[in-house]
Amino acid sequence: MVRLDLADVVLRRMQEKDIEAVKALIKEGCEGTENRLILHLLTRPLALLLLAILSSILRCVLHSFVLALVIPVFISVIYLKLTIPRSAGILGSCRPYWDYIGSSYHADTEPDLPNPHLGRAKLTTNQEKTRRRKKAKEKEKMNESEQVDEDELKQRAKVAGEVWVADSDGEIVGCVARDGWSRDGVCRVCRLVVQCWYRREGLGRLLVQGLESRTKQKGVCRVYAHVPIPSKVGEAFFRRLGYRLQGETAGIEEEEEDDYEDPEKGWLGYPLTKVFVKDL
């Protein structure tokens, strides 16, 4: 496993040049999740009942037990393979797809998320100069390429949400997505991904805590996090950060009424996510 110095990590908004790297990172993080979600949905009681009924009908038609058993499962898996990736990529979003262009609009003007590890090490003069040159070149490219309708981009940016990336010497090693949900005092974390080489280094914790700190400054008092339902690692991670599963309250009626967030729904209406809550 590669060691990562958190003092060298910059937590900044995703820019247009980062979109392909972020998509690849999310795709990598979804590889195991997608298969576990499919297995979870196929083993629900209603799904098993429907598969059994269809298998019985096909057995009478095809006169083959093996084909009658395999065909319904095969068709269901193909269907879920085609429909789940959109949901597995960014979970819990209020929109059916993620607008990466809208999320990156004017991202370079947004200040970085706080990183408490930055005080341990300072960049050398050469590194600072290189970073300034990169930013200057990026601004020039943006001015040349971003000739899209400004009003349209502003409208898209309002509802597109935010993607914050962990940048280590120009390499995107992690990201966290915040939905563009407009409910007052609430923030929704839709996806947290860390590159496989840098897991267990504290990077995920750094991303989430940095986002919590920024949203708290903006008046947000509650954070919801959507975690894929078969992910035990994700559940343990958010519990360690002080989150609780939605519905786990002290028994106070007012708290239980406020403590509600719709989980992402999948095939036959079964939830794809667990919703975790934290009051800031």
UniProtKB/Swiss-Prot annotation:
Catalytic activity, EC: 2.3.1.-
A cellular-component GO term for this protein: membrane
Top EC category: transferase
Membrane-spanning residues: 37-57, 60-80
Residue ranges, annotated region (Disordered): 111-152
Gene3D superfamilies in alphabetical order: 3.40.630.30
Recorded superkingdom: Eukaryota
Gene Ontology MF terms in the entry: N-acetyltransferase activity
UniProt keyword tRNA-binding, yes or no: no
Annotated ranges, domain N-acetyltransferase: 116-273
Keyword Transmembrane helix set for record: yes
PANTHER family linked: GNAT FAMILY N-ACETYLTRANSFERASE, N-ACETYLTRANSFERASE 14-RELATED
Sequence similarity: Belongs to the camello family.
Protein name: Probable N-acetyltransferase 14
The species this protein was found in: Danio rerio
